[in-house]
Amino acid sequence: MHHRINQAKTYALMVLKPTPKYFEADSRPIVWEHGRRNMALQAAGIMPIVCPVGDEQISGICIFNTDADEARAIMAEDPGVRAGIFIFEIHGCRGFPGDALPA
């Protein structure tokens, strides 16, 4: 167990929450661009785990392969955040490199 704990790495956990604007029809194109950006961040290894959540309180969670400050800066540039469609929380966390969601 000590060996495994010593392999832990710092990541950032993001919780994405919708604002009332999320539910407006004219927000759909911006939400689409938000999703495209997330896929690009995932492909680049910056946001390796992305989990959309389908309820009214949380839109999604993800793990950033960065520290919390860098994750905040990345999310501040998100088109949905900039448009006031989403708000987010960032929490520093630790995990084990190579962990993944099961196929």
Question: Where do the language-model regions lie?
Answer:
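Conserved, structured core segments of small domains
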Residues: M1-A103
